[in-house]
């Protein structure tokens, strides 16, 4: 049956009993479940209960329910499931309950609060918080008075929010993911960062997305630099596993050779002339392994007030597991910046700020939405595991053609600092939990649909 939302409370006059509204009456109900915790109990019905479900105090605690809340009730296979219980997986914990995730504490508090307001239970955890023998986790929950630790069951579904690739590659974290997925059949979404080159290859092979892609090659060489710089006004060399616009080089052919612009990790901008590709590559190799980089065709982007502009488009799966476009923003290059990243001095504008003409604005929305949804479907078809959100960087050239530069499985959220984009910030977060609810329900009612043999 479809889940329905109820207030979850405690009955202090009974023992080991789950009280349901009469509207949910079914024969043969034997168990109550919360997350992966299942307890045999007596199920009774009360006519006066309409939007409330009550549990005997001992049953409430045995199921490890952390507090009264609003949650979905899903009845399947003689069991009443309360939830969903969503675990947000991360790393980088501190001992402080005031700021348990350092600078990310505010982000996680908003995420947990948003989910619990919508219905269900949500906590943050890491590999070290799992008690494998007991099948429990010491999770961090955010309540009115701040962060608190509670022992909860293993969750119905995991939303991966590891902060970076280096941490993701930890053997402990890889083992933790594998064990929860393989042994406990817990759906885990956005479980890896995308590799730029792997994504490019997947999209390039599919006729639905190949037309969006600028020419890209792995491992810049003298021959490739000469060829691409001869064919295009600008060429970019970027890390295959980069983030936030770091480590990117812009190459332009000149009468005297090459001009190379770069913003380093310290955000210092440089522009250096080289006599030829060989001299640049020799200097480049002193600091980098070329096989970790790709070389990409530059695109003559549309401009806003004389500065190049591109677009961040977010897609999320919804409560039905369907892709939706949740946010579109314009990113405008900063002074002396070779990218539009905010970390390199770029600025964010809404579409309405850039396109005065409503008809033109609608046309841009249609173009970008169609491209983003198509790319989302293709990546879903070809990448193993569950994907619930993607952040795309698109460009539109001077001729109106759409180009796709990047896809990120854990997109940055700096665009949402714009005051007119706060509402879509909440929407993208809400969609992630809608998809978590979808995965949780499917894992309970039809696991074969999630993990076909």
From Swiss-Prot:
Keywords: Membrane, Sporulation. GO terms for biological process: sporulation resulting in formation of a cellular spore. Pfam families: ATPgrasp_YheCD (PF14398). GO terms for cellular component: endospore-forming forespore; membrane. InterPro entries: YheC/D. It is a peripheral membrane protein. It is found in: Forespore outer membrane; Spore coat. It comes from the Bacteria. Gene3D superfamilies: ATP-grasp fold, B domain (3.30.470.20). Its main location: membrane. The keyword Membrane applies. Involved in sporulation. Belongs to the YheC/YheD family. This is Endospore coat-associated protein YheD. It comes from Bacillus subtilis (strain 168).
